[in-house]
C-alpha cells in the first residue's frame, strides 16, 4: 500500500524533489530493486491477458513471473544498469493487521470473481482477478534461481525489502532504489526511482530522441522543500496512513502537514486534536511505527560490501532450466541468451558513448554562448602564445639559456634561477651605463678618456654567458 496520498502531496508541495529523467541517467549505476513489486506486476499480467498472460509450464503453472522478470532484467543489462534484487523476509508484527485485511479483501474479491464469471461480466472479472493476486514462495524461489543463473546478486531481507534497500542506499552500496511504493522514502532512501519498467511514458533527450522516462525523487530535496526534519517527515507519513497502523479520520496528507508545521510532532498534535471530530483508531501505536521506520530490522550494509558481485551468466544452465522445466521454446531462449551475451560489458561501453555523445540541444542562445566562449578561448590562447614566445625570446636573447616550454617542476626552478641571473645582470649593466654617462657629462675631453660603450656591452654579455655556463 505504501503511504496514502504521499505521491500526489509531493507533486503539489515539493515539486523540485521529483525529476523526469531518461534511463540513460542510470548508465553504470548499481540499483537496488524491490523484487516483490516487479513480481506483482507480472502476475497481474496474467489477469489482464497481456503478453505474458497465458504462459504456463507442462504442469499448468504460470510462468509469467519468470518471463516478465527475465525480459525486464535483460533490458536493464542492455541499458548498462547493474541490478541488485531484494526479496521480502518475515513481515513485522505491526503489519499483521494489514495483512489480515488484505487476506479478507482477496477472499471477498474471489467471491465477486465467481459471481462475475457466472454472469459473464468481463470487466468485473478482470478487476477481481487482479485483487486475488498473492505471490507464493514457489514463485519467489523461481525468480531467485533464475537471477542466480544470470549472475545477478540476490538479497533476502530479514523483514521488509524496502527497508533493506534503504539501508544499502544510505550506506552508498547502491545509487538508488527502484520501487513504486512511497514508503521507501519513509525508511530513509536518499534516492527513489519510479517507473523503471521501460513502458511508462517517454522522455526526449537533448537530440530530440524519445527515450523511456523515469521519475526520480530525492529525499534531501523533499525535506528541504517541505521544511521538515527526517523525524517530522516520518510523522507525516504515519499521519497520512501506512501499512503499520490505522489512520485518524479527517486527516489527510495536507492537513497532517499543516498540523506538523504548527505543532512539530504527533504527540503535540494528538493532545491538541478534537477527539470527537478526529477520533483515534484502535491501532495507532505511532511510537512503535516511528521506531520501525527509523530503526528497521535489516542486515547492516557492511555485511554486503564484499558480497555484491556480478558473475558471468550460466547460459547453459539457464537454457536447460527454461526449456526443460518451464516449457520455454528453444528459439525464444536462444534469443534471450544472445541478448545477454551482447549486454555483457555494456556498462563500460555505454558510459563512454554517453560521455562523448550526449551534448546539449543547440538553440540560438546556446550558439551565441558558444561563439563567446570560442572568442574568449582564442584570446587566451593568443596571450598564452605571446607569453611563451616572450619567455623564449628573452631567454635566447641573453645567451640562449632555454628554448623549450617549461613542463616540469625542475624546469620551472631552473628557468627561475637563470632568469634571476639575467635580471641582476641587466640591473648592473644599467647602473654601469648610468655611471659612465655621468662621468662623461662631468668631465672634459682633456682629462677623461672616452668610454667605448659597445665594447662594454660585449664584455657584460660575455661575463653573463660565463656565469650561466658555470651554474650548469
From Swiss-Prot:
GO cellular component: mitochondrion; nucleolus; nucleoplasm
Entry keyword annotation includes Metal-binding: yes
Binding site for DNA: 47, 72, 160, 241, 243
EC number(s) recorded for this UniProt protein: 3.1.-.-
Keyword Magnesium applies: yes
Database matches in InterPro entries: 5-3_exonuclease (IPR002421), 5-3_exonuclease_C_sf (IPR036279), Flap_endonuc (IPR023426), HhH2 (IPR008918), PIN-like_dom_sf (IPR029060), XPG-I_dom (IPR006086), XPG/Rad2 (IPR006084), XPG_CS (IPR019974)
Keywords per UniProt: DNA damage, DNA repair, DNA replication, Endonuclease, Exonuclease, Hydrolase, Magnesium, Metal-binding, Mitochondrion, Nuclease, Nucleus, Phosphoprotein
Function, as annotated: Structure-specific nuclease with 5'-flap endonuclease and 5'-3' exonuclease activities involved in DNA replication and repair. During DNA replication, cleaves the 5'-overhanging flap structure that is generated by displacement synthesis when DNA polymerase encounters the 5'-end of a downstream Okazaki fragment. It enters the flap from the 5'-end and then tracks to cleave the flap base, leaving a nick for ligation. Also involved in the long patch base excision repair (LP-BER) pathway, by cleaving within the apurinic/apyrimidinic (AP) site-terminated flap.
Subunit structure: Interacts with PCNA. Three molecules of FEN1 bind to one PCNA trimer with each molecule binding to one PCNA monomer. PCNA stimulates the nuclease activity without altering cleavage specificity.
Protein name stated in the entry: Flap endonuclease 1
Amino acid at each position: 500500500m505504501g503511504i496514502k496520498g504521499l505521491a500526489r502531496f509531493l507533486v503539489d508541495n515539493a515539486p523540485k524533489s521529483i525529476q523526469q529523467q531518461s534511463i540513460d541517467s542510470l548508465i553504470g549505476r548499481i540499483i537496488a530493486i524491490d523484487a516483490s513489486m516487479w513480481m506483482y506486476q507480472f502476475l497481474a499480467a496474467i489477469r489482464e491477458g497481456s503478453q505474458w498472460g497465458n504462459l504456463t509450464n507442462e504442469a499448468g503453472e504460470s510462468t509469467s513471473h519468470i518471463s516478465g522478470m527475465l525480459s525486464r532484467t535483460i533490458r536493464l543489462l542492455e541499458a548498462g544498469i547493474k541490478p541488485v534484487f531484494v526479496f521480502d523476509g518475515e513481515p513485522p508484527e505491526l503489519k499483521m493487521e494489514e495483512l489480515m485485511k488484505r487476506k479478507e479483501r482477496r477472499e471477498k474479491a474471489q467471491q465477486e470473481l465467481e459471481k462475475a464469471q457466472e454472469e459473464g461480466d468481463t470487466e468485473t472479472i478482470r478487476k477481481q482477478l487482479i485483487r486475488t493476486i498473492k505471490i507464493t514462495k514457489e514463485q519467489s524461489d523461481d525468480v531467485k534461481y533464475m537471477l542466480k543463473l544470470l549472475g545477478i546478486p540476490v538479497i533476502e531481507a530479514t523483514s521488509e525489502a524496502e527497508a533493506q534497500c534503504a539501508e544499502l542506499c544510505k550506506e552508498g552500496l547502491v545509487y538508488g532504489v527502484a520501487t513504486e511504493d512511497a514508503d521507501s522514502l519513509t525508511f530513509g532512501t536518499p534516492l527513489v526511482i519510479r517507473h523503471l519498467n521501460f513502458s511508462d511514458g517517454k522522455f526526449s533527450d537533448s537530440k530530440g530522441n524519445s527515450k523511456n522516462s523515469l521519475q526520480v525523487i530525492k529525499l534531501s530535496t523533499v525535506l528541504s522543500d517541505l521544511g521538515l526534519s527526517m523525524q517530522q517527515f516520518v510523522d507525516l507519513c504515519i499521519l497520512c496512513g501506512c501499512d503499520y497502523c490505522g489512520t485518524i479520520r479527517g486527516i489527510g496528507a495536507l492537513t497532517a502537514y499543516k498540523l506538523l508545521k504548527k505543532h512539530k510532532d504527533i504527540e503535540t498534535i494528538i493532545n491538541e486534536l478534537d477527539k470527537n471530530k478526529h477520533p483515534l483508531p484502535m491501532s495507532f501505536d505511532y511510537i512503535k511505527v516511528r521506531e520501525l521506520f527509523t530503526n528497521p530490522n535489516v542486515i547492516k550494509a557492511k555485511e554486503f560490501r564484499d558480497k555484491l558481485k556480478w558473475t558471468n551468466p550460466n547460459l547453459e544452465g539457464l537454457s536447460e532450466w527454461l526449456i526443460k522445466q518451464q516449457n520455454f521454446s528453444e528459439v525464444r531462449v536462444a534469443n534471450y541468451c544472445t541478448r545477454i551475451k551482447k549486454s555483457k560489458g555494456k556498462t563500460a561501453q555505454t558510459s563512454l558513448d554517453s560521455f562523448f555523445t550526449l551534448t546539449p540541444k543547440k538553440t540560438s542562445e546556446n550558439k551565441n554562448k558558444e561563439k563567446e566562449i570560442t572568442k574568449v578561448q582564442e584570446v587566451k590562447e593568443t596571450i598564452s602564445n605571446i607569453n611563451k614566445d616572450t619567455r623564449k625570446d628573452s631567454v635566447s636573447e641573453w645567451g640562449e639559456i632555454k628554448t623549450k616550454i617549461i613542463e616540469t617542476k625542475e624546469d620551472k626552478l631552473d628557468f627561475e634561477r637563470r632568469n634571476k641571473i639575467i635580471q641582476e645582470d641587466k640591473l648592473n649593466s644599467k647602473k654601469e651605463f648610468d655611471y659612465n654617462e655621468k662621468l662623461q657629462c662631468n668631465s672634459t675631453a682633456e682629462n677623461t678618456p672616452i668610454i667605448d660603450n659597445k665594447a662594454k656591452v660585449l664584455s657584460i654579455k660575455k661575463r653573463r654567458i660565463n656565469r650561466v655556463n658555470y651554474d650548469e
